[in-house]
Amino acid sequence: MAIKLIALVITICVASWDSAQGRSLRFSTTPLNRYSFPPHFDFGVASSAYQYEGAVEEGGRSPSIWDNFTHAFPERTNMDNGDVAVDFYHRYKDDIKLIKEMNMDSFRFSLSWSRILPSGKLSDGVNKEGVQFYKNLIDELIKNGIKPFVTIYHWDIPQALDDEYGSFLSPRIIDDFRNFARFCFQEFGDKVSMWTTFNEPYVYSVSGYDAGNKAIGRCSKWVNSLCIAGDSGTEPYLVSHNLLLAHAAAVEEFRKCDKISQDAKIGIVLSPYWFEPYDIDSESDKEAVERALVFNIGWHLSPLVFGDYPETIKTTAGNRLPSFTKEQSMMLQNSFDFIGINYYTARFVAHDLHVDLSRPRFTTDQHLQYKLTNRSGDHISSESDGTKILWSYPEGLRKLLNYIKNKYNNPTIYITENGFDDYENGSVTREEIIEDTKRIEYHQNHLQQLQKAITEDGCNVKGYFTWSLLDNFEWEHGYAVRFGLYYVDYKNGLSRHAKNSAKWFKHFLQRSGKPMPLDLFKSVKNWWSAIPMI
């Protein structure tokens, strides 16, 4: 009993002192909040240049491959494009206020290569107006207490480089990207401490060069009749190979740039799913899970950790997979301070016995069938809405983080994207979308699994970014899919409206404010009940 009385006194004293400092208690009656995570854990929202900025013909910007793709093949992007997008170029100051309003720590955005170097080449000159835009953006973020988290390349290479030499199909891209990255470090490095080189090389290589459903829209004709040219059996491997070498070249520049602070970090952003066996009793389906993870993660992470591609991919792809020289392998190995993980969903996988070897392509090299249901007909998620693009499977995030921890030496990780989609088919009102209950549940459940991965499993995760701040241009889906914490009214001047998920994050991330008496009572009660009677 004496110990309980002492504990009660200590609790009340701590509560009173904390309240006097203008802070709420570090423990909460809610299941989860900011203080459920380690000190200095980074919470933020994510975006990208083409999906947000608009102003494609303003400020000296030249066309990117996405400008060309959306205008040449509008039917492949829902008849939409990023010409205006959500007009972030003109509205960034107001949008930064929205980030601050939610108590976010950081804002992840990408640099438009064609806005900074219109020809793609540093030797051809710099667009000063484009550089100034990003300097203004960075300054505005810092002024509002928000940390800039910069991605150098998010899929929007200048069209000029593709016209000249095929962009990432050519090793010439390595030096052009090196020069672009070095310029960015020199111009912005004194105010930016968190950098990533590339966003989702898997999606960029596979969707752009195997399936052809995203820019640059290349693939074998038999894969997608809309593709004008391409080779789905070789080009995805070649593009990722050159991309990895460009990444390593950029990291070399980062580590010798005198404008970069000593505590600055650089990484790359990967986008793996988690996988479960289609048939839990099938050994071949269990092996298929490992193979899926090797192709989805190991293809790009193994070279950075171990200096080479996984043996599984080398065996399967054979001479269609380029090889690294010894020097390149050494340059790649450990060329990161952290790994960004974009996690959204999971799939069931089964071993595929029926692969047409006469028509090689990256997707069939995996010898996998990706499925939405398992053998019993159960979905990976209880969310069985047929309009969903992504299915909620929070357990997959924890499993994925543990897989990376165990297989790749527990690297520092940031969850650089995690988000929930609403498909707008015209049958849902704005009010219903803003209610946003499912998005709140999605983030809450994923944060719970993330917290367990950190505190119970020892996964080295340092931050969590939601996709996205605003509804925006979602690539081949155009504006029909909404991921934002803020609703964008595309029919009424692109006005922004907070969804309930934005309000939920504001509460979840709250740092200050005196605790209410009821909260104080409940917190004391929780401590009291947790201490054994003596």
Swiss-Prot record:
Q: Name one Pfam family in it.
A: Glyco_hydro_1
User: Which molecular function term from Gene Ontology is one that the record holds?
Assistant: beta-glucosidase activity
**What PANTHER family does the database record attribute to this sequence?**
BETA-GLUCOSIDASE 31-RELATED, GLYCOSYL HYDROLASE
A GO BP annotation: carbohydrate metabolic process
Residues bearing carbohydrate? N68, N374, N425
EC numbers listed for it are: 3.2.1.21
Query: Does the entry annotate any disulfide bonds, and if so which pairs?
Result: C219-C227
Coiled-coil ranges from the UniProt annotation:
none
Q: Where does a beta-D-glucoside bind?
A: Q51, H154, N199, E200, Y344, E417, W467, E474, W475, F483
Q: Which UniProt keywords apply?
A: Disulfide bond, Glycoprotein, Glycosidase, Hydrolase, Signal
Provide the organism lineage as a comma list: Eukaryota, Viridiplantae, Streptophyta, Embryophyta, Tracheophyta
Q: Which reaction does it catalyse?
A: Hydrolysis of terminal, non-reducing beta-D-glucosyl residues with release of beta-D-glucose
Residues of the signal peptide = 1-22
Q: Which organism is it from?
A: Arabidopsis thaliana
- Name it: Beta-glucosidase 32
Q: Classify the source by domain of life.
A: Eukaryota
Per UniProt, the enzyme's principal EC class comes to hydrolase
The entry's family comment says:
Belongs to the glycosyl hydrolase 1 family.
Residues the record marks as active site: E200 (proton donor), E417 (nucleophile)
